Swiss-Prot record:
It comes from the Bacteria. Residues 178-217 are annotated as: Disordered. InterPro entries: T_IF-3_C_sf, T_IF-3_N_sf, Translation_initiation_fac3_CS, Translation_initiation_fac_3, Translation_initiation_fac_3_C, Translation_initiation_fac_3_N. Coiled coil: none annotated. Gene3D superfamilies: Translation initiation factor 3 (IF-3), C-terminal domain, Translation initiation factor 3 (IF-3), N-terminal domain. It comes from Synechococcus sp. (strain CC9605). One of its GO terms (cellular component) is membrane. Keywords: Cytoplasm, Initiation factor, Protein biosynthesis. This is Translation initiation factor IF-3. Belongs to the IF-3 family. Its main location: cytoplasm. GO terms for biological process: ribosome disassembly.
Length: 217
């Protein structure tokens, strides 16, 4: 029997960025932090310039002749790159329809679990199909099922809005929720903002009584 192949369990070696002393080219074309061209200078001179400005020398184009480096704050640059990558990943997210199923006689604990599931789906940018399943004669209680779905929509209103109102679909009742694009401003918050605005409006000055000149004799 041939021996089983051995798998390397060691963590993969992370490729370190080509910055500062890791740059091994003797001549470099250097761009300053503000975009100004410093021309072709030696590696040592480029490192001295970066150190004097308390910045990093970063290799940005290794295939150029000579290689191109830029003087910058590498920590800030890396943070911005990671931020852009996250935003691009978020924009490329394909919206899916996730389903949350329940019975119209659901207890509070199970209802809270379904709410938590829906919140996670909505946070990920997915739509939620809320389904109430009927069995046998339970189909007679569509009004209770609709009440349950509208309660769920109310409990999720800060994160979602109704895309399709509750309706019958075969032996089920369904409702579609979609992630809310703009934050919900509740009625109480609107009233508080309006009251605050009224309080900040200065009161008009009170009219003063005109003085009547006394006749001179």
């Amino acid at each position: 029997m041939p021996p089983r192949p051995r798998f390397d369990r060691r963590a993969p070696v992370r490729e370190l960025p080509n910055i500062n002393d890791r740059i091994n080219y003797p001549q470099l074309r250097v761009v300053d932090s503000d975009g100004a061209q410093l021309g072709v200078i030696s590696r040592e001179e480029a490192l001295d310039v970066a150190r004097d400005r308390e910045l990093d020398l970063v290799l940005v184009s290794e295939k150029a002749d000579p290689p191109v480096c830029r003087i910058m704050d590498y920590g800030k640059f890396k943070f911005e790159q990671e931020k852009k990558a996250k935003e691009a990943k978020k924009k490329s997210h394909q919206t899916e329809v996730k389903e949350v199923k329940m019975r119209y006689k659901i207890d509070q604990h199970d209802y809270d679990v379904r709410i938590g599931q829906a919140q996670r789906f909505l946070k990920a940018g997915d739509k939620v199909k809320c389904t109430v399943i009927f069995r046998g004669r339970e189909i007679q209680h569509t009004a209770l099922a609709e009440t349950l779905l509208r309660r769920m929509a109310k409990d999720l209103e800060e994160k979602a809005e109704i895309q399709q109102a509750p309706k019958r679909e075969g032996r089920n009742m369904i409702m579609f929720l979609t992630p809310r694009k703009t934050p919900l401003v509740k009625k109480e918050e609107k009233e508080q903002a309006a009251n605050k605005a009224v309080r900040t409006i200065p009161a008009p000055p009170r009219p003063t009584a005109a003085k009547v000149a006394s006749p001179q004799g």
